[in-house]
From Swiss-Prot:
Residues 1-22 are cytoplasmic. It is found in: Cell membrane; Cell surface. The soluble form derives from the membrane form by proteolytic processing. InterPro entries: CD40L, TNF_CS, TNF_dom, Tumour_necrosis_fac-like_dom. The lineage of its organism: Eukaryota, Metazoa, Chordata, Craniata, Vertebrata. Glycans are attached at residue 240. It comes from Callithrix jacchus (White-tufted-ear marmoset). The gene is CD40LG. Belongs to the tumor necrosis factor family. PANTHER family: CD40 LIGAND, TUMOR NECROSIS FACTOR FAMILY MEMBER. Residues 122-261 form the THD domain. SMART domains: TNF. PROSITE patterns: THD_1 (PS00251), THD_2 (PS50049). It is a single-pass type II membrane protein. Residues 44-261 are extracellular. This is CD40 ligand.
């Protein structure tokens, strides 16, 4: 008996999607992306177009309103008296609002200008004068890097700064001196910032002292004075020292000034 053997048919290997399906999916993806981009562009265009239409509509309404006012003034019979009176009252209200806004702006500007006039900047900075070696009250000059903001502060007789407006002032002074005295005279060098109120006696506001130096030929030392004080119109301030012959008058050594706060 002859037995026959049939080999099993091998299963076909799994294949991917057909090429037509890949092309379809690719086209569908491109279509969706294009549609999204187109929708976004259309939305932007529509938004801008609506804004433009809104502006044109507002402009048209303004034109119609002005045209109606013109027709009311010419007395055309196509408009009733009631409509004309109402339109005129609206127009007058608009004009009044505009004029009020202009007046308020003018008042604000005027107030700012008056405020600037009422509170001008007052400042002074003067430099020491070498001729003050013979008097205890230091003398000053408007030279070098000096400041004299306006006529509300003046340098009187080269010795004192006089203010013409009441207020708080920051007053300062720097005195540089050369102390090379003999050992027999060891009194400290004293600088005083003094005030002379109008019709009153002068008084000392600030005072500072520094000991002498034995350095040869000269040991430079500086004294700084500064403070905030209330000054009346016509008040004067000046600087007094115990030994003016020791004061250094070089550039930037000795100065004096004030500033209205």
């Amino acid at each position: 008996m002859i037995e026959t053997y049939n080999q099993p048919v091998p299963r076909s290997a799994a294949t991917g999607p057909p090429v037509s399906m890949k092309i379809f999916m690719y086209l569908l993806t491109v279509f969706l992306i294009t549609q999204m981009i187109g929708s976004a562009l259309f939305a932007v265009y529509l938004h801008r177009r609506l804004d433009k239409i809104e502006d044109e509509r507002n402009l048209h309404e303004d034109f119609v309103f002005m045209k109606t006012i013109q027709r009311c003034n010419t007395g055309e019979r196509s408009l009733s008296l009631l409509n004309c009176e109402e339109i005129k009252s609206q127009f007058e209200g608009f004009v009044k609002d505009i004029m009020l806004n202009k007046e308020e702006k003018k008042k604000e500007n005027s107030f700012e200008m008056q405020k600037g006039d009422q509170n001008p900047q007052i400042a002074a900075h003067v430099i020491s004068e070498a001729s003050s070696k013979t008097t205890s009250v230091l003398q000053w000059a408007e030279k070098g890097y000096y400041t004299m903001s306006n006529n509300l502060v003046t340098l009187e007789n080269g010795k004192q700064l006089t203010v013409k407006r009441q207020g708080l002032y920051y007053i300062y002074a720097q005195v540089t001196f050369c102390s090379n005295r003999e050992a027999s005279s060891q009194a400290p060098f004293i600088a005083s910032l003094c005030l002379k109120p109008p019709n009153r006696f002068e008084r000392i506001l600030l005072r500072a002292a520094n000991t002498h130096s034995s350095a040869k030929p000269c040991g430079q030392q500086s004294i700084h004075l500064g403070g905030i004080f209330e000054l009346q119109p016509g008040a004067s301030v000046f600087v007094n020292v115990t030994d003016p012959s020791q004061v250094s008058h070089g550039t930037g050594f000795t100065s004096f000034g004030l500033l209205k706060l």
